[in-house]
Amino acid sequence: MPSAPRKQSKTYKVPRRPFESARLDAELKLAGEYGLRNKHEIWRVALTLSKIRRAARELLTLDEKDPKRLFEGNAIIRRLVRLGILDESRMKLDYVLALRIEDFLERRLQTQVFKLGLAKSIHHARVLIFQRHIRVGKQIVNVPSFVVRLDAQKHIDFALSSPYGGGRPGRCKRKRLRSQQEGGEGEEAEEE
């Protein structure tokens, strides 16, 4: 246990109304499109988005030349641009309020692996990440919800230890190669 006890807070917020058909349909569509395992993954992103939008809304109430608005507003915008959520052409607090859940889900490692063509489907991308076949830079990442920064996006590739990345072949392939080699040796012995 750490020396200083920490207050653990929830990473998601459940919807106020549990059976709202429009919301349920929208969540199901998002879960299918981005290959999410459960609604908690959507709610977690929704909480992050709501915190950022709340901060932006609070800053927009201040005067435009207010030092707090300038400093904190630039920090929020810079962070969102670095993550690739906000475009560089839209670097204003008004655009932060227009962000959607999809903008955050697009930056997940699972989505990026699928979009780069390393996986056949969004679900295959999730499996590849879990099985430690994907690296970002030199680091193997096995968390599908890892948020990929804009500068790290070009460094997504197969891990060097993975059979997909030129590493040791998988168990089935090794077995097949061994049987082919033994079969080839058996034929040579018969010819002599």
From Swiss-Prot:
Keyword Ribonucleoprotein part of the UniProt annotation: yes
GO terms under cellular component: cytosol; cytosolic small ribosomal subunit
Ranges where the record places region Disordered: 166-192
Keywords assigned: Cytoplasm, Phosphoprotein, Ribonucleoprotein, Ribosomal protein, RNA-binding, rRNA-binding
Main location: cytoplasm
Residue ranges of every copy of the S4 RNA-binding domain listed in the record: 107-181
GO MF term set: rRNA binding; structural constituent of ribosome
Signal peptide bounds: none
Superkingdom of source: Eukaryota
Modified residues (Phosphoserine): S89, S179
Coiled coil: none
SUPFAM superfamilies noted in UniProt: Alpha-L RNA-binding motif
Localization annotation: Cytoplasm
An individual GO BP term: cytoplasmic translation
Function: Component of the ribosome, a large ribonucleoprotein complex responsible for the synthesis of proteins in the cell. The small ribosomal subunit (SSU) binds messenger RNAs (mRNAs) and translates the encoded message by selecting cognate aminoacyl-transfer RNA (tRNA) molecules. The large subunit (LSU) contains the ribosomal catalytic site termed the peptidyl transferase center (PTC), which catalyzes the formation of peptide bonds, thereby polymerizing the amino acids delivered by tRNAs into a polypeptide chain.
Subunit structure comment from the entry: Component of the small ribosomal subunit (SSU). Mature yeast ribosomes consist of a small (40S) and a large (60S) subunit. The 40S small subunit contains 1 molecule of ribosomal RNA (18S rRNA) and at least 33 different proteins. The large 60S subunit contains 3 rRNA molecules (25S, 5.8S and 5S rRNA) and at least 46 different proteins. Interacts with snoRNA U3. uS11 interacts with MPP10. Component of the ribosomal small subunit (SSU) processome composed of at least 40 protein subunits and snoRNA U3.
Additional notes on this entry: There are 2 genes for uS4 in S.pombe.
Record family assignment: Belongs to the universal ribosomal protein uS4 family.
Protein name: Small ribosomal subunit protein uS4B
